[in-house]
């Protein structure tokens, strides 16, 4: 069982533990906790119906129970999504991630925990996302970057960490990995005799990268 903030409701703690049991990554569980804590704070503010209050005035959601959750409908959720867009300036990709968090939470409450009679997020739609072209460095830019990492002009800690930094940049360039994937590398992921690095991708998918 994981330890979570004392001011979040037991229902949310149970949901986070459920995801930990499914072997979801710590990063994913942290996102769920952040997204759902803010969502529940907003809904609590919405139900208070006091225009003098703001979401910052909601200091705790520990008292939220199944009765409260049964009172949430689809319009409440869309009100929260509008708040994220208009007041928080969240980009479509950020709002889409939060939609996924909310849908997963209510699906758990309805089908697994059986704490709510209906799933208000079942018909919740995600913002449309424009296609983003991948950004990449040219061969010349990559070469210059690696050259600068090994520059003799570096001093102090920069000089001491030259080999580490060179290895990090090389992995980024050659494997196209994310920062979260890089920091998750364990010594057991490296086969030195075969020059193979196993990268753990999203959804626990694995990719082998060759290195020299």
Regions found by a protein language model. Give the residues of each.
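Conserved catalytic core of the tyrosine transesterase superfamily
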Residues: 1-212
